[in-house]
Amino acid sequence: MSDLPGIVVTGASGRMGQMLMKTVLASGKARLVGAVERPGSDWVGRDAGAAMGGAAVGVTVTDDPLAAFAQAQAVIDFTAPEATVQFAELAAQARAVHVIGTTGLEPAHLERLAWAAHHAVIVRAGNMSLGVNLLTRLTQKVAEALDEDWDIEVVEAHHRMKVDAPSGTALMLGEAAARGRGVDLAQARVSGRDGITGPRAPGSIGFSAIRGGDIVGEHDVIFAAAGERITLRHVATDRAIFARGALKAALWGQDRRPGQYDMMDVLGL
């Protein structure tokens, strides 16, 4: 068992953090060696398993990420942008693979991740599921095949607690559509519409976001032309798909050269 890669989960008390820890513990492919929470969290100092309402697992939740990362081969991180860039720098110091599922990252955050990737492996994706990554590849292929007579819209739905929009997955799909079209998403993107907007701009890629209830994640990519429409859709019903994908990425990253990778690399797509 000690030969299995050691994994640290950040944001341990969150829904994804707990799902990630449970997935690692049940996998038989890795060991949970650390759980990180913010200073002041009532989880700090408790056994991670007991804090989740189960049996003790021998891992104490800590607010010292570097100490945790130093004993790990990989860090899985679904937290917030500012925390993620700090974790990236610490994971690079520890030479641990850093798997990032955090969304809402801005250009300044990405610059700091690029620095960290000179020293360690970073696997970052807006979505870790196999299905969504296949959808991303399909979106690019369809966008390549269709001309600008086909309008492209990305519609996503998530639970009421999600704080960023459009989702990281929606942006990933939009980037795929833009690549297929040979355009810059920053120039083509239209996010939401309200009031008198005028006719749709040719070649634009639209985004719409829905927030409500406990929706895990739904994404539609719509290609609409006069008289016909194609919809590519992915529906997530269980967060475990993201946790399984993240663990797969953490294992894949072992012994890779430092650099930035994504789930397409992990899945060989």
From Swiss-Prot:
Active site per UniProt: H158, K162
Protein residues bound to NAD(+): G11, A12, S13, G14, R15, M16, E37, G101, T102, T103, A125, G126, N127, M128
Location of this chain's protein in the cell: Cytoplasm
Catalyses which reaction(s): (S)-2,3,4,5-tetrahydrodipicolinate + NAD(+) + H2O = (2S,4S)-4-hydroxy-2,3,4,5-tetrahydrodipicolinate + NADH + H(+); (S)-2,3,4,5-tetrahydrodipicolinate + NADP(+) + H2O = (2S,4S)-4-hydroxy-2,3,4,5-tetrahydrodipicolinate + NADPH + H(+)
Purpose of the protein: Catalyzes the conversion of 4-hydroxy-tetrahydrodipicolinate (HTPA) to tetrahydrodipicolinate.
One GO-annotated biological process of the protein: diaminopimelate biosynthetic process
Record EC number: 1.17.1.8
Enzyme class name: oxidoreductase
Database matches in InterPro entries: DapB_C, DapB_N, DapB_N_CS, DHDPR_bac, NAD(P)-bd_dom_sf
Claim: Nucleotide-binding is one of the keywords in the record: no
The organism of origin for this protein: Cereibacter sphaeroides (strain ATCC 17023 / DSM 158 / JCM 6121 / CCUG 31486 / LMG 2827 / NBRC 12203 / NCIMB 8253 / ATH 2.4.1.)
Signal sequence bounds: none
The protein, known as: 4-hydroxy-tetrahydrodipicolinate reductase
Assigned protein family: Belongs to the DapB family.
UniProtKB keywords: Amino-acid biosynthesis, Cytoplasm, Diaminopimelate biosynthesis, Lysine biosynthesis, NAD, NADP, Oxidoreductase
Residues reported to bind NADP(+): R38
Binding-site positions, (S)-2,3,4,5-tetrahydrodipicolinate: H159, G168, T169
Cellular component terms per the entry's GO annotation: cytosol
Pathway: Amino-acid biosynthesis; L-lysine biosynthesis via DAP pathway; (S)-tetrahydrodipicolinate from L-aspartate: step 4/4
Pfam families attached to this UniProt entry: DapB_C (PF05173), DapB_N (PF01113)
Transmembrane segment boundaries: none
Protease recorded as keyword: no
Gene Ontology MF terms in the entry: 4-hydroxy-tetrahydrodipicolinate reductase; NAD binding; NADP binding; oxidoreductase activity, acting on CH or CH2 groups, NAD or NADP as acceptor
